[in-house]
């Protein structure tokens, strides 16, 4: 039997929103396999589909800037929200974005080695800022995009940099449309541009979970297939940008809105500060442990 730790129970709770003891039981039944435990809870109707990147824990800010040909979205982390609101920190983030936009390095490692206008490397520039600001600071990630003449970048920053989105539309130069799409992505967080981008493996996996879910609900086998077909279609529309109701006008889809301008979404990047990074929460672990031992 797998050793089910308090940390595992905590992680499953965060990913599914299910109760503590339900999570413990799911992990026991699946011998500690986190992904199978998520499916177990969903099949029992206890949890909804988990988004693997939902765990937001660190501080900092995102930033998006562009010029006529290129755009960059990046995330810089700090230890506290207080520092993230500090003018010096925000100036550092802006300087790093301008540096990456100008140099367009291939990797994070390359970016840290590039030379700033003042002669310092990016790494030394960050190290100096750490000394001044008094907190650990790191350039976590970035993406650079390039566009053609008949294209448009959309930039949107939400909650003072908590979320940063960069979109690229082809077939239109309407930056307002591109920004509207970026705003939608910030709010709804789609996984894909279109349902055609969803892998066969993901579709089949979701179909299996939905089938078991319907059977566990006691539905007759002869109607399960139609139920699964309808639920799968709904699932695909929920994770695909083009199929989603547009936040500024729910009567049309995002795909239809973009088509009105003659364009098409070809890529998007959505960064949320700290997604996938977990803070240490000893008190919560102790609380869980006390329940697990009962």
From Swiss-Prot:
UniProt keyword terms in alphabetical order: Cytoplasm, Elongation factor, Protein biosynthesis
Alphabetical list of CDD domains matching this protein: UBA_EF-Ts (cd14275)
GO cellular component term, pick one: cytoplasm
Keyword RNA-binding recorded: no
Keyword presence, Metal-binding: no
Pfam families: EF_TS
InterPro entries in the cross-refs: EF-Ts_dimer_sf (IPR036402), Transl_elong_EFTs/EF1B (IPR001816), Transl_elong_EFTs/EF1B_dimer (IPR014039), Transl_elong_Ts_CS (IPR018101), UBA-like_sf (IPR009060)
Entry's Gene Ontology molecular function annotations: translation elongation factor activity
Primary location group: cytoplasm
Involved in Mg(2+) ion dislocation from EF-Tu, as annotated region: 80-83
Protein localization: Cytoplasm
Listed HAMAP family: EF_Ts (MF_00050)
PANTHER family for the chain: ELONGATION FACTOR TS (PTHR11741), ELONGATION FACTOR TS, MITOCHONDRIAL (PTHR11741:SF0)
Family: Belongs to the EF-Ts family.
Function according to Swiss-Prot or TrEMBL: Associates with the EF-Tu.GDP complex and induces the exchange of GDP to GTP. It remains bound to the aminoacyl-tRNA.EF-Tu.GTP complex up to the GTP hydrolysis stage on the ribosome.
Name of the protein in its database record: Elongation factor Ts
């Amino acid at each position: 039997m797998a050793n089910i730790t308090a940390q595992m129970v905590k992680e499953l709770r965060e990913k599914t929103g299910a109760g503590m003891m339900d999570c413990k039981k799911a992990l026991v039944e699946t011998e500690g396999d986190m992904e199978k435990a998520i499916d177990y809870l969903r099949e029992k109707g206890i949890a909804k589909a988990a988004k693997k990147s939902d765990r937001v824990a660190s501080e900092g800010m995102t930033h998006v800037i562009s010029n006529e040909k290129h755009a960059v979205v990046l995330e810089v982390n700090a230890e506290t929200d207080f520092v993230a609101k500090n003018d010096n920190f925000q100036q550092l983030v802006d300087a790093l974005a301008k540096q990456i936009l100008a140099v367009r390095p291939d990797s994070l490692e390359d970016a840290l080695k590039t030379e700033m206008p003042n002669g310092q490397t990016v790494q030394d520039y960050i190290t100096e800022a750490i000394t001044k600001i008094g907190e650990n600071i790191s350039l976590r990630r970035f993406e650079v995009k390039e566009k053609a003449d008949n294209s448009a970048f959309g930039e949107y920053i939400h909650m003072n940099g908590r979320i940063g989105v960069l979109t690229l539309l082809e077939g239109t130069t309407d930056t307002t449309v591109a920004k509207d799409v970026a705003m939608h992505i910030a709010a709804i967080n789609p996984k894909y541009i279109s349902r055609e981008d969803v892998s066969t493996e993901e579709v089949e996996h979701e179909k299996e979970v939905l089938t078991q879910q319907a059977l566990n609900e006691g539905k007759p086998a002869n109607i399960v297939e139609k139920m699964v077909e309808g639920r799968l279609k709904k699932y695909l529309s929920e994770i695909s940008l083009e199929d989603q109701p547009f936040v500024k006008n729910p009567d049309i889809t995002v795909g239809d809105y973009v088509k009105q301008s003659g364009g098409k979404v070809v890529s998007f990047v959505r960064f949320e500060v700290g997604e996938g990074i977990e803070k240490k929460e000893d008190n919560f672990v102790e609380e869980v442990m006390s329940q697990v031992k009962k």
